[in-house]
Amino acid sequence: MRLLMLLSVLEVCWAQYNPHTRYGQTSIVHLFEWRWDDIALECERYLAPNGFGGVQVSPPTENAVINNPQRPWWERYQPISYKICSRSGNEHEFREMVKRCNSVGVNIYVDAVVNHMCGKDVSAGISSTCGSYYNPGLRDFPAVPYSGWDFNDGKCKSRSGEIESYNDIYQVIDLGHEPIKSSEYFGNGRVTEFKYGTKLGTVLRKWNGEKMAYLKNWGEGWSFMPSDRALVFVDNHNNQRGHAAGGPSILTFWDARLYKMAVGFMLAHPYGFPRVMSSFKWPRYFENGKDINDWVGPPNDNGVIKRVTTINTDSTCGNGWVCEHRWHQIRNMVIFRNVVNGQGFTNWWDNGSNQVAFGRGNRGFIVFNNDDWALSSNLQTGLPAGTYCDVISGDKNDDHCTGSEIYVGSDGRAHFSISNTAEDPFIAIHVDAKL
């Protein structure tokens, strides 16, 4: 009885690190600023069939309506109550989304804002997504209800006791030189590893003398948190706009060629639990090195979010939505990760520069060329003999491949050729893409 009780306690203590996706699903996607009804439809028509395990949704709670600037993306992070009522939809639509997504095996993960309420610079009134009254200056949020007695000024080590100036407070994004460490949050669950996208972007941009060859010990070897504690990502809604952590090294959809390589590497490598970004476009305009339009909100008609209903013939999105998760290279790497789940990191190869390759046991193999010259090498894949479809250049349709084919010999070796001018200078093969 004591042994069983101890095992039960240990199981509960470790449960917070399990993302609880369905068996065999190994990644999630952030559908940033999507409507609840569009997310429900996307779960059914695309995410579930392609092996995505879950969706991170934008904050669902009632927020202040900001009109200067006009309806920015960050108004979602100015809560005035915990009513499920935002420009993504109401509580009924949220419930239906969860029900429909769960019914096809896709989980919903909420970006919950619990650290703060709407800032005091926002005027009092009922200009909110659900019409509730609020007075930030008096810290009066009766729809919660919160009053000034519910706030903790003394615990904020800043000049004002509040967080309107980020220069006043400790940065909780741990880039390795902050007084607050990511390990302090391990008790709550997996923690976002911001160093991941920052470092990977620096390597792929070849800044500061970095090379892909140095990625052989990627993960804890780069002073990241333990793999089973980490939620990893190339970019997020914040740092793709130059905010928060990362700076100019962060790769985004604006850098499509390198971005696809970065996401491909993330999904092929066993470190951490990955989150794919799905964005919307905005009219970037730089003055003195700063994008003065970084506030722009999602595609909308008079404040109402546009439906993600324009799906192009290549399955990508229109109507102002980028939908990186629908790029076939990224979709196929989500599938790749599912196929190689549980396999080790094997058969590393590099040329000492920016041509690298590695396998995932006997289930998958990937090759990158980020050099300024062509790659042509015979490499040990660890895969069974046969002909494989490269899932970056195409898809396996029945017994045919719409892209390049790779032949693996009886010794597990295969020849790979990748031009340095290729639109997608990487190749990925796995056992489910065997012809």
Where are each of the predicted segments found?
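Classical eukaryotic N-terminal signal peptides for Sec-dependent ER targeting/secretion
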Residues: 1-8
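Glycine-rich FAD cofactor-binding loop and adjacent beta-loop-alpha segment at the N-terminus
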Residues: 79-85
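Active-site-proximal N-terminal segment of extracellular/periplasmic enzymes that hydrolyze or transfer
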Residues: 34, 50, 121
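Acidic-and-aromatic substrate-binding clefts and catalytic sites of carbohydrate-active enzymes
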Residues: 32-41, 63, 87-90
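Active-site-proximal helices and loops of the catalytic beta/alpha 8
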Residues: 10, 14-27, 42-48, 52, ...
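Short, intrinsically disordered, charge-balanced linker/junction segments flanking boundaries
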Residues: 97, 155-179
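Aromatic- and acidic-residue-enriched segments that line the glycan-binding/catalytic groove
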Residues: 65-78, 115-164
